[in-house]
UniProtKB/Swiss-Prot annotation:
Entry membrane topology: Multi-pass membrane protein
Gene that specifies this protein: pdt1
Pfam families, A to Z: Nramp
Gene Ontology MF, one: metal ion binding
Domain of life: Eukaryota
Similarity annotation: Belongs to the NRAMP family.
GO BP: any one term: iron ion transmembrane transport
Keywords per UniProt: Endoplasmic reticulum, Manganese, Membrane, Metal-binding, Phosphoprotein, Transmembrane, Transmembrane helix, Transport
Protein name as catalogued: Manganese transporter pdt1
Localization (cell): Endoplasmic reticulum membrane
One annotated Gene Ontology cellular component of this protein: plasma membrane
Length: 521
């Protein structure tokens, strides 16, 4: 056979294949729509299902469904992290801001949520790339004196956070079950048993998902409760509320700035940084195990995510946390402030507003059920926040000083320290003093925030820390190829990150100066 004849036969085969493909497509369209023109979407789906012909829409549809399925596998940590932003401390600061300035500090609530989402994205990036949480990274890269200093600050933040959970839960128990405050404070230590039974970070994914689902249900109850309360409270025009999300001169007044710093401290919680960087490893490890890249040994402390797993998981993890914070956390915090602004603003009780008084006013001016819904939301917030505070405390102690204390014992110690000031205040001055302790704990958290975020900023901007080495084999030569992948922040994001950190630091320095001068708020 001549060369020319050979190529002619190949050309005929190609033409025949093309004609056959087009005939299949035409036949499919005719079968689908014998009498009238159908939509392109239906045609494309039929071609894909019946003949296996890939079309533009079918490829796009497959890509979307695949992305949604993969995203659903990462749902869970966002709910645990969101709990840190809707704890009883937020009730106190948002209640104070709403009663004094109505809706004008909603801008700070929104800004705080933006900061929280951005800092959480850094935490997830750090935890995913290094395979270690923020505390463990500090132990790996700092000397023990610096590490112990950060550990002490982190423990103070955990205790200050726990104080808010204790007070919120005790107040809710008194409202709902008429349990005395002192007894309610003592009862809060019982949640240690629930955490001991439920939380198994080194266990199977099923046990982790069960715990995440339980906390997610608590978060949903809080959100639904406030949705109902918002529907029953007269908040004025929607324009007035939405105007509060715009910057206002009130933010820069002395009283407004103090409330703003309190909101920042209550929203951008320091212990949430350890949660965000520590919760991602479970899913990364599970994915590497299923792909055959890692075999669990002991407590899995030697685990480091592969580049393939990091590349696949990083975006899903960040999006999952961002959606959780922008939906549940932002909605709940805004709702608390809006309800307080609608009920307390320009009233005689604005200066004495606390968790008890907002319950009384809701019960008197709206309905008894509305007041009880508020108390239910407060109770579930305190419970769920107490659970995740236990997890954060465990990450802190194990990461900074390698203190492998049993979770229940560590929880007993932390909660025992936290309930001491609450017991003293509740026994001495009753409910009037608890609100002051609650507000002070949130300001304390705000002061600690710049110190605990500094290592996070340093690590995520460092090429040395944020690099991953991957090995592959050249198929032709069989040689080992080693590649280094840089996940550190670029110049633009580095500037943004340091700008946020400097902003938070400047606010807290101003607060410290005012407190040192004895300025009253």
């Amino acid at each position: 056979m001549s060369s020319q004849s050979y190529y002619m036969n190949d050309l005929d085969d190609l033409r025949s294949l093309e004609s056959s493909t087009l005939n299949k497509k035409d036949t499919a369209i005719n079968e689908l729509n014998p009498e009238q023109n159908d939509t392109r979407r239906s045609t494309d789906l039929l071609l894909e299902d019946k003949y296996g012909i890939q079309t533009g829409f079918s490829k796009y549809w497959k890509k979307c469904t695949y992305g949604i399925r993969e995203y659903c596998k990462f749902i869970g940590p966002g709910f645990l992290i969101a709990v840190a932003y809707i704890d009883p401390g937020n009730y106190s600061t948002d209640l104070d801001a709403g009663s004094r300035f109505q809706y004008k500090l909603l801008f700070i609530v929104f800004l705080s949520n933006l900061f929280a989402v951005y800092l959480q994205s850094l935490c997830i990036r750090l935890g995913s790339v290094t395979g270690m949480d923020l505390a463990r990274n500090c132990r790996e890269h700092y000397n023990r004196y610096i590490c112990w200093s950060f550990y002490v600050l982190a423990e103070i933040a955990i205790i200050a956070t726990d104080i808010a959970e204790v007070i919120g839960t005790a107040v809710a128990l008194k409202i709902l079950m008429h349990i005395p405050l002192v007894a309610g404070v003592v009862i809060t230590i019982l949640d240690v048993l629930l955490v001991l039974i439920a939380w198994r970070p080194e266990g199977s994914m099923l046990s982790v998902r069960i715990f995440e689902t339980a906390v997610a249900l608590l978060v949903l109850v809080v959100a639904i409760s406030f949705a109902v309360v918002l529907g029953r409270v007269h908040i004025g025009g929607a324009g007035t509320v939405f105007k509060g999300f715009l910057p206002s001169s009130t933010v820069f007044s002395r009283e407004g700035l103090y409330s703003s710093i309190g909101i920042l401290g209550a929203t951008v919680m320091p212990h949430s940084l350890f949660l965000g960087s520590g919760l991602v490893q479970t899913r990364l490890r599970d994915l590497d195990v299923r792909r055959g890249n890692y075999t669990p040994v002991g407590d899995c402390s030697d685990y480091r995510p592969t580049h393939e797993t990091i590349k696949h998981s990083l975006t899903y993890s960040i999006v999952e946390v961002a959606l959780s914070l922008f939906t549940f956390a932002l909605f709940t915090n805004s709702s608390i402030l809006i309800v307080a602004g609608a009920v307390f603003y320009n009233t005689s009780g604005a200066d004495t507003s606390d968790l008890f008084s907002i319950y009384d006013l809701l019960k008197e001016y709206v309905s008894i059920s509305c007041g009880r819904l508020f108390a239910v939301a407060l109770l579930f917030s305190g419970m769920s926040a107490g659970y995740v505070c236990t997890i954060a405390g465990q990450i802190v102690s194990e990461g900074y000083i390698n203190w492998n204390l049993r979770p229940w014992l560590r929880r007993v110690i932390t909660r025992a320290i936290a309930i001491i000031p609450c017991l003293v205040v509740s026994a001495a001055v009753g409910q009037s003093g608890l609100n002051q302790v609650l507000n002070a704990s949130q300001v304390c958290l705000s002061i600690l925030l710049p110190f605990l975020t500094f290592p996070l900023v340093m690590f995520t901007c460092s090429r040395k820390v944020m690099r991953v080495v991957s090995d592959s084999t050249n198929e032709e030569t069989g040689q080992l190829i080693r590649e280094t992948h840089d996940y550190s922040l670029g110049w633009t994001m580095t500037i943004v990150t340091w700008a946020i950190w400097l902003f938070l630091t400047a606010l807290n320095l101003l607060l410290i100066v005012w407190l040192g001068m004895g300025v009253s708020f």
